[in-house]
Amino acid sequence: MTSTSPKSRRSSGKGRKGSKKKGKQVSQIPPLSKTPPSFRNRIVDKKALKQLVAWAYKNHGTAVTAAMADNLKDLGFKYATQAAVSISVDDLKVPDAKQDLLGEAEQQITATEECYRLGEITEVERHTKVIDTWTETNERLVDAVKKNFNQNDPLNSVWMMANSGARGNMSQVRQLVGMRGLMANPQGEIIDLPIRTNFREGLTVTEYVISSYGARKGLVDTALRTADSGYLTRRLVDVAQDVIVREEDCGTSRAILVKAEDGRFGNRLVGRLTAEQIVGDADEIIAKKDTAIDPELSKKIEKAGLAGIMVRSPLTCEATRSVCRKCYGWALAHNNLVDLGEAVGIIAAQSIGEPGTQLTMRTFHTGGVSTAETGVVRSTIAGKVEFGPNARVRGYRTPHGVEAQQAEVDFTLKVKPTGSGKTQTIEISNGSLIFVDNAQEIAADVTVAQITAGAVKKSVEKATKDVICDLAGQVRYESVIQPREVTDRQGNITLKAQRLGRLWVLAGDVYNLPPNARPVVKANSKVSKGMVLAEASQASEFGGEVRLRDSIGDSREVQIVTTSMTLKDFKLLEESTHTGEIWNLEAKDGTRYRLNSIPGSKISSGEIVAELADDRFRTKTGGLVKYAPGLAIKKARSAKNGFEVSNGGTLIWVPQETHEINKDISLLMIKDRQWIEAGTEVVKDIFSQTAGIVTVTQKNDILREIIVRSGEFHLCNESKVLERFEDEGQMVNPGENIAKGLKADSMVLVQTVESRDGKGLLLRPVEEYTIPDQAQLPELSHVKQEKGPSLGLRATQRLAFKDGELIKSVEGVELLKTQLILDTFETTPQMTVDVEVALDKRAKTINRLRLVILESILVRRDTMSDSSHGSTHTELQIKDNQLVNADDVVATTQILCKEDGIVQLPNAVDDEPIRRLIVERAQDTTVLTAKDNPILKVGERVVDGDLLSKGEPINCCGEVEDIKGNKVTLRLGRPYMVSPDSVLHVRDGDLVQRGDGLALLVFERQKTGDIVQGLPRIEELLEARRPRESAILCKKPGIVEIKQEEDDESVVVKVIESDDSLSEYSILLGRNVMVSDGQEVHAGEFLTDGPVNPHELLECFFGDLRDRKPLLEAAQESIAKLQHRLVTEVQNVYKSQGVSIDDKHIEVIVRQMTSKVRIEDAGDTTLLPGELIEIRQVEDTNQAISVTGGAPAEFTPVLLGITKASLNTDSFISAASFQETTRVLTEAAIEGKSDWLRGLKENVIIGRLIPAGTGFSGFVEELRAEAGPHPDILAEDPAGYRRMQNLRPDYTVEMPVSTAAKSTSVLDDPSEEDLEATRSRHGIDPTTSNFAAFARPSGDDPSQEDQKPDPIALEGLQEEGLLADE
């Protein structure tokens, strides 16, 4: 293929070829230059095509480019058809080198596993090494794939596709023909089992499952990402929608510096305008001020070798509430200066939001630090190592567990050849690792050192990993570990290793003992199979009668009756009813009790056992209850169970029938206050049971209730008598006179009642019930142990209703209940009482009720060979119905030995029972025979490869127990390496089972890509979130001094500032200090690692600059520093995912986030402290106030997240349509805000033309018309008025806003007295006239804009010489 270089401005031959083919389509193409195109021979891939199309577009416009692109497409298809490019499974060629590479990796991993088995490296180091080995193998395999295709099949369709950029990339090809590689589990941790096969060879089932972990995560991710990204775009649009290009040039002198990266600017300068003249080496002017930088100029600047260029940027633009054309630069759509009225804010928002879907949401955790082989230096010759004279090294252990040395200073290392040859010199920098010792003889191609570029402190975090035991046995520490007890803040004691060392687990058979078992064998005694090792017994607490129950599952219940109580005078009878079984107790005199708790149930103290079934206290209807004097009840907390009688007496009952109806009034069949007979139908289907006077209650034509009061009715017209018995009436005793000719025969309740015939007296019958002082208690018989609980019953009488209570009912009610209640003494809360049926001892046909307290003991059955418990053998020591005393043994359990061996007991800790013991069996030891005298000592621990005698290695690990002649007895064991500061879960001499945790390794791993990546990170930046544990930042510049505290846990970093003052920063546990002693630091520099808090960073910058510069400059500079930082951070996230966004888009958004300041002190302005206001407005206000000599407002810059910034815009319509609608609108209403409809959103909501694009010019005209005589309205908020209002009302001044505006007469600063005198002399009322009103209208109300100053007042001022004659 041939191509025209994008540099060449002549047309390519292809364009011509196409134009012949499609004459019609290309006829509008302007004639191209006649010079023959230069011939270039190079491969055109995706990138070159892009450049070609871009070149055509730039030089020849859209039509030509479209035609050319079409022709290119035809060309591509034509040749692809001729070449018959296709793709098939056979094109996926697996490189032959794959097997060897995998083999090598396997070998390395086997070696690593072996090191781990011998306790040379820790679990963490093993994991890290395995993962790194596979990562490296994968990389090498990718290279092999590339090499294979390049050499053997360069025209392979898969290779061409990936290589040209048409589809796919190397990482995908790698999975097709290399290996799929390492996968992460759902928690994001890398599984150390990689997928060795590729899709061409096919995956095994295990590999397939592991592989689909990641795939599923990807799918879920994509779904969430779309939503998140959409919301991000919405917030961005909201914050930037009112940024429109409104001015040609804001005339600012501020700019930003764009620095070259590795001497190159790339595309970062293209489309910007220079802020100053650019001068090259020989004072040649490369570009004048305000020149647009195109790619050619950008290359020129690069060639001139300039490190940085000052360019104009939206960040520094001083146009109010918009950006000007020159600060924005090119519109990237057509590579020309942006047009006026272009809505650049929305373009910026969409450019940042749209790629959001392409970012990952993943948060990664790798298992350990991934140290790629960076800067590894190998020896080129065989020779002797020599360190330079100033060399200082310290021991260091790499993350892979390799012992090495770390350089503390920069020095030179030489390898002097043993034979002939040139000396190899290696420059070692501070912090580099050296894998050889001084004066060591080494061979060629040995790894000598790993050079790090400077002492870069990486950001690390603490992580932990468990060490799990692989065999049962006894733990032994190596003395090196030096465990120490650490007490944390909660007072918990943990054991920590101080040094790197091994924990040994020496093999043996570990028996777990049941909770109350005790060993019956002595330490170090011999035991044989079937011997009893330990014994546990179960005893009765109180004693009593034994009952054996049938066994359930693998255990058997033994019940011991400690206490029982029988009701011996009552027969227990069972009745069947339609609701179920009912049990009754019947006494000899025929009184019956209903049993509340049926046999077989459990009850506790205070529960009701039975209730007297008694009809003596049952009424026929509802009525009124009255207590006669003498009847008393106990006070109770709740009346749920009625009122307990304390003193007996008489209960008086007045019957009254109440029908609760709730039906329509039309169904009523009688009249109110009518006398009716018993059996009368009062409402349809409801009949009265007694005769008497009816009272009907109704509400809203709904019948509520009908009351029938029975008795004799006598008409009466004596008012005194009627008054006496009004309301509730009175009780009248027999023989007492009620009225003339009316005497009571029996006790009655007399009430005054109105009937249909007139007023009269109703004599209501009364029933009396006598209540005894105490209820009768049945006879009981007890069986009780000496110590232990006892039972009792008590009888109580309870009244259901209180004095004066009215019971609304048709059916009768029970007034008094007699209950039997259970009482227990000296019981524990968990003891329950069982209800049982017992046969009478004499008459076997009669059942009696018995209440018993049982002690239940569960006895385990024999478990023949449960691996951890050994064989257990359980025996019951009692028989059924036997009587046992307190503390008698009920059952014993013996733990039997499974194999012959020697018993060892663990170290006894004070008073703690022994829970495990160990038997050392024959298979736990091995006898080695040495050819020569053994060179080992008893008690020494050895691993594979150690020498038994001279030249005779051992092939197992363990501890030497005995040496007889040349026979060595070795107890097998397994070492585990623990790193310093690991938490030990076991103590020396403890016994462990397989699978127990031995220790928790604490290690540091690199924070991978700050863990938060992609969308969440972008959101964190743009919302200016405060991270949870942010880095500690330096507040003022100075020299660092690091001091370790006594308790060795925390570090204090001191910074000695220029004025010799000290700032102390205490650093918490687990944070890494990122500075070194004596280092010079600047404000805002990191003292520890961790995510940065942008708000704190701004404070640091501002605090530092505030001391050295004027307020406004300090604010602008600190904001500029922060802006630069934010833009870079956002760019980094997108770049890491391969998305390119032009800086200016991010700048537009960041500008909106940093445009406000917070007023701290209002000075003489009318601003409010705490108010958020644009920095430009404060600047203008302060400038105005300074003319009059007033105190300016003090402020601090603030950073607002995009949501906050959207809610803080001047337009309340825009803010309300975004979030918190009610709050925003209420506040706006209370403050009486006006919305000036500047942005797009407000206008869209109201339905006006938007002030962008074609509507822009109309918008400017409209504003001018609105402004009337004050063209100022275009310049500022509610115009310059806002600035005028910010002054105290006693000053009048107007700042020249633009050169066009004539400067107005300026007041000197008159004193209060001067003003007062002037007012009085000219008869000005101080309440109506305000001097400041002469220079400004008094509000944002346009109707007041034409307000003219008061002519009398003006004259007065001129006469006083306080105002110039103009």
From Swiss-Prot:
Compositionally biased residues, Basic residues: 7-24
Record field: compositional bias (Polar residues): 25-38
Residues given in the record as Zn(2+) binding sites: 250, 317, 324, 327
GO cellular component: a single term: DNA-directed RNA polymerase complex
One Pfam family named in its UniProt record: RNA_pol_Rpb1_3
Region (Disordered): 1-40, 1299-1366
EC number: 2.7.7.6
Any GO MF annotation of the entry: DNA binding
Required cofactor(s): Zn(2+)
Keywords: DNA-directed RNA polymerase, Metal-binding, Nucleotidyltransferase, Transcription, Transferase, Zinc
Biased composition (Low complexity): 1353-1366
Cofactor binding remark: Binds 1 Zn(2+) ion per subunit.
Catalytic activity: RNA(n) + a ribonucleoside 5'-triphosphate = RNA(n+1) + diphosphate
A biological process from GO: DNA-templated transcription
Function of the protein: DNA-dependent RNA polymerase catalyzes the transcription of DNA into RNA using the four ribonucleoside triphosphates as substrates.
Complex formation: In cyanobacteria the RNAP catalytic core is composed of 2 alpha, 1 beta, 1 beta', 1 gamma and 1 omega subunit. When a sigma factor is associated with the core the holoenzyme is formed, which can initiate transcription.
Cross-referenced PANTHER family: DNA-DIRECTED RNA POLYMERASE (PTHR19376), DNA-DIRECTED RNA POLYMERASE SUBUNIT BETA (PTHR19376:SF54)
Name of the featured protein: DNA-directed RNA polymerase subunit beta'
Organism: Prochlorococcus marinus (strain MIT 9211)
